[in-house]
């Protein structure tokens, strides 16, 4: 069961694209969003050298979202070292405890778990060269850190980074909208999907059409080709993992190999379209 949450957000310079601090009621964690260009200002915070984990966000040469996941005993000092790296990152999120209760073992544990969460979600390309080592910790500490992870994920998402969110996390929990929708169409198209908070998710194993029609738009053709090149669609034209499209129509078009209106093409087990449910 999900509960309502109260989030406190402090925008340091009145600029929503600048430095932001986020906290959650009754939680000792704190999350900072810092741009690369404003990292020096972070050093002025009393807790800037607290222990924690951090995430560096950027784009690769193909314009795909990337993330580097790290841990630090002294947060600002570690982040400053990354300024010497090539410009593979633009923004940073640092997660610390306000009372500095996290130790090195805690940070290593968090680094490993966030790495695995990001890999599982598949939202961004994780550019760590190795899998972070997971520390051995007590059952008490593990329970505490699992709650820490859950709260940190919520705040990272609130700041606009869905890097750790799986399809299950994003499913819209509202009446008929949380049921599966299906497409079974020409040229072998056979897919199922779900409405999620940031678009429409097509499930792993769904099959797309074996060919496309000549009238399919260039942008859709490029998207289909890109998904095949990245291995998200395999040689059998099936999705290798759950994949979130920005809209039901985009998802339907890739599945059917032609321009499509997703609000009328996707139907649930009762043969109701998304349009039917929205207007009922």
Annotated model-derived regions:
Residues 90-150:
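Internal, well-ordered alpha/beta segment that forms a basic, Gly-enriched binding/recognition surface
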Residues 56, 72, 94-96, 204, ...:
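Hydrophobic side chains in beta-strands
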């Amino acid at each position: 069961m999900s509960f309502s949450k109260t989030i406190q957000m402090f925008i340091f310079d009145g600029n929503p694209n600048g430095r932001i601090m986020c906290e959650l009621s009754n939680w000792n964690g704190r999350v900072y969003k810092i741009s690369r260009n404003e990292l020096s200002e972070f050093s002025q915070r009393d807790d800037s050298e607290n222990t924690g984990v951090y995430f560096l966000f950027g784009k690769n040469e193909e314009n795909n979202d990337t993330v580097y996941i790290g841990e630090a005993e002294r947060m600002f000092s570690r982040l400053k070292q990354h300024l010497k790296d090539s410009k593979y990152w633009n923004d940073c999120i640092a997660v610390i405890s306000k009372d500095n209760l996290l130790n090195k073992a805690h940070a290593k544990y968090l680094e490993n778990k966030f790495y695995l969460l990001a890999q599982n979600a598949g939202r961004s390309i994780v550019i760590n060269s190795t899998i972070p080592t997971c520390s051995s910790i007590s059952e008490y500490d593990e329970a505490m850190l699992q709650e820490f992870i859950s709260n940190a994920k919520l705040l990272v998402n609130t700041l606009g980074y869905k890097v750790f969110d799986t399809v299950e996390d994003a499913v819209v929990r509202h009446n008929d909208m949380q049921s599966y929708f299906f497409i079974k169409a020409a040229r072998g198209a056979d897919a199922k999907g779900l409405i999620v908070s940031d678009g429409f998710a097509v499930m792993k194993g769904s099959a797309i059409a074996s060919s496309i029609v000549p009238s399919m738009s260039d942008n859709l053709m490029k998207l289909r080709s890109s998904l095949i090149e990245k291995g998200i669609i395999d040689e059998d034209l099936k999705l290798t993992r759950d994949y979130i499209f920005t809209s039901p129509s985009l998802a339907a078009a890739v599945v059917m190999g032609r321009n499509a209106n997703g609000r009328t093409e996707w139907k649930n087990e009762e043969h109701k379209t998304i349009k039917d449910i929205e207007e009922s």
